[in-house]
Structures are given as structure tokens and as C-alpha cells.
Swiss-Prot record:
The active site is at S78 (nucleophile). Keywords: Hydrolase, Pyridoxal phosphate. SUPFAM superfamilies: Tryptophan synthase beta subunit-like PLP-dependent enzymes (SSF53686). It comes from Burkholderia ambifaria (strain MC40-6). GO terms for biological process: 1-aminocyclopropane-1-carboxylate metabolic process; amine catabolic process. Disulfide bonds: none annotated. The keyword Hydrolase applies. The keyword Coiled coil does not apply. GO terms for molecular function: 1-aminocyclopropane-1-carboxylate deaminase activity; D-cysteine desulfhydrase activity; pyridoxal phosphate binding. The gene is acdS. The lineage of its organism: Bacteria, Pseudomonadati, Pseudomonadota, Betaproteobacteria, Burkholderiales. This is 1-aminocyclopropane-1-carboxylate deaminase. It comes from the Bacteria.
């Protein structure tokens, strides 16, 4: 596997820490040892997160093309767009963000606080669009890029989650290589890696990276899209492309992509009772915060799988904490009593 042939622009602090979740593990019976890899602490750029790791491989391409404006898209409370805005500010570039109405959540401050507030503070041109949720290429995003061209700028396209970008899977191939180096220091290997999946390139990169040592199907995606067929297909397609460009040496098969679809409801961006219980449990036992859109759902999935005995006794499970905490203030009404 040859990740090193791709240029990388450093936006993160370095390898993210692996933290044992001792109290949560004990609360769940102690037979499975839970750990978290803290991608939510990976950068000093506006809280960082998993997209910042991905952007390290997109930014060299943007600079090589002479782009002056990063153009990205997401929902109103998109973590992706906040991270793109931060990187643009850091590099002295312009930033246009398309924020679509992906979540059916009615709150008068939803589009004024959290991620979107931070993006505005960092100088991004934020454009609210009424279109609903979809993980594919969006008309509104293409129109935003054309508007930059018409104004004499040179846009660089960064799709939702970086996922439809040809280099979007590379960052989390690097994540797998980083985990292997940390495992050598820890003296053990993780039996499973749990990760939230929506647009797909985070899990896709992990699948390719862990395929290098035979653990592709030990990456357990927890769907948060509530459109699992689309998400599974997109993970598989991105993983196959990424495997080719990093010269993995084997094809990614359907069985390499594991996506648990039980925890996404009621729909994208809205938590269920299990999501909320997982958020509160992790916060109160570990002081680790997760959000109701992504990490609360993957935390719910991991906790439930432990309770159901779906991880063998003695297993060591690594939870990939991808970020998302800045969105919590947009859901303040849900958590008004903690």
C-alpha cells in the first residue's frame, strides 16, 4: 500500500490519542474493553474533526490548481462546512458554504448557533438553501461554484463529507496506519473499530487501511443516514476507488463493508431514545461528549452491541470519535435539563 505518494498538508496536531473508556466498559459488564480514538481533538482549527484529517489530502490539490475559494456543502449544522471554513481562514482563502435543510428539526435558533455560527465568525459566505437531505452531488453546490467563477474567482469543489472527491478516502487510510503504529506501542490489536457512516469516505478509508492487515470487515459502520442502501453503495464505491489509487493489491468486496442499520432512526439528524441515552451515559461516565446527529448514534450502536453480546468476551473495541460537539447548542431544547 502506497499512501506516501500523495502530498499531505498538515492541519492536525499529529496522531490522535487513544483513550480507554474504563468506566463505560465497567458499566456495561467489563467483558469488553472500550477505547476511543479522539478525532474530535485532532486540530486547533475550530475544534477539528474527521473532515480535517481528510482535508489534509485535498488541500495540496487545491493549492496546485491555484484555487482561491473553497466551496463546500452540508446541512445547516454541518461539521464539514465548519471545518472547511476553518481551513480556508487558516490558509487565507475565501470560502463559500451551501447549507441545505437536511434535518427536520424546528427550532428558532437552529440556523444561528453551533457549526453555522462558527462558520460565519470565520468569514465564510454562508448560503442557506431549502433543499432536503441527500448524500450525492447537489445542484445547489454546483450553482455555488458557478457563481464563484462568474465573479472571477477560482473555486475548489469539496463535496459533502469530502466523500465524492477522488482523494476523499485517503485521510482514513492514514487513520488505519496510525492505529497500527499505536497498537505496536500498546502491545495489542483492536478486534473491532466502530465508526459512524453517512456520506461514506471515513468508513471507506478505514476499510482500505485495515484491509492491509486483514481487518476490513472488523470496521463496523453505524449508519446515521437512514438511507442505508445509498450509504453502503457509496462506501463500497469509494473504498474500491481508494484501494486502487493507494495500490492496496486486492479488490474490496461487498463483505468487506459492514454497515449496521439499526441505530439511524427516526431519520437523519434526529435522535431516538437510544441515541439520547448513549449521549448522556457517555457524558456522565466518561466526560466525553457526543452529538445527536452522528456520534450519539454510533455510541448508541457500540453500547447496544456490547449489551447484546455481539462483541466476544475479551474483545477490545476502538470507537472512532469523529467530532460533532459544536452542533450540541443547536439541540439545546432537547438537553435543557441535561
Amino acid at each position: 500500500m502506497n499512501l506516501q505518494r500523495f502530498p499531505r498538508y498538515p492541519l492536525t496536531f499529529g496522531p490522535t490519542p487513544i483513550q480507554p473508556l474504563k468506566r463505560l466498559s465497567a458499566h456495561l459488564g467489563g467483558k469488553v474493553k472500550l477505547y476511543a480514538k479522539r478525532e474530535d481533538c485532532n486540530s486547533g482549527l475550530a475544534f477539528g474533526g474527521n473532515k480535517t484529517r481528510k482535508l489534509e489530502y485535498l488541500i495540496p490539490d487545491a493549492l496546485a490548481q491555484g484555487a482561491d475559494t473553497l466551496v463546500s456543502i452540508g446541512g445547516v449544522q454541518s461539521n464539514q462546512t465548519r471545518q472547511v471554513a476553518a481551513v480556508a481562514a487558516h490558509l487565507g482563502m475565501k470560502c463559500v458554504l451551501v447549507q441545505e435543510h437536511w434535518v427536520n428539526y424546528d427550532d428558532p435558533v437552529y440556523d444561528r448557533v453551533g457549526n453555522i455560527q462558527l462558520s460565519r465568525m470565520m468569514g465564510a459566505d454562508v448560503r442557506l438553501v431549502a433543499d432536503g437531505f441527500d448524500i450525492g452531488i447537489r445542484r445547489s453546490w454546483e450553482e455555488a461554484m458557478e457563481s464563484v467563477r462568474q465573479a472571477g474567482g477560482k473555486p475548489y469543489p469539496i463535496p459533502a463529507g469530502c466523500s465524492e472527491h477522488p482523494l476523499g478516502g485517503l485521510g482514513f487510510v492514514g487513520f488505519a496506519e496510525e492505529v497500527r503504529a499505536q497498537e505496536a506501542e500498546l502491545g495489542f490489536k483492536f478486534d473491532y473499530i466502530v465508526v459512524c457512516s453517512v456520506t461514506g469516505s471515513t468508513q471507506a478509508g478505514m476499510v482500505v487501511g485495515f484491509a492491509a492487515d486483514g481487518r476490513a470487515d472488523r470496521v463496523i459502520g453505524i449508519d446515521a443516514s437512514a438511507t442505508p442502501e445509498k450509504t453502503h453503495a457509496q462506501i463500497t464505491r469509494i473504498a474500491r476507488h481508494t484501494a486502487e489509487i493507494v495500490e492496496l493489491g486486492r479488490r474490496i468486496d461487498e463483505q468487506d463493508v459492514v454497515l449496521d442499520t439499526r441505530y439511524a432512526g427516526p431519520e437523519y439528524g434526529l435522535p431516538n431514545d437510544g441515541t439520547l441515552e448513549a449521549i448522556r451515559l457517555c457524558a456522565r461516565l466518561e466526560g466525553v461528549l457526543t452529538d445527536p446527529v452522528y456520534e450519539g448514534k454510533s455510541m448508541h450502536g457500540m453500547i447496544d452491541k456490547v449489551r447484546l453480546g455481539e462483541f466476544e468476551p475479551g474483545s477490545k473495541v476502538l470507537y472512532a470519535h469523529l467530532g460533532g460537539v459544536p452542533a450540541l447548542s443547536a439541540y439545546a431544547e432537547i438537553f435543557r435539563n441535561g
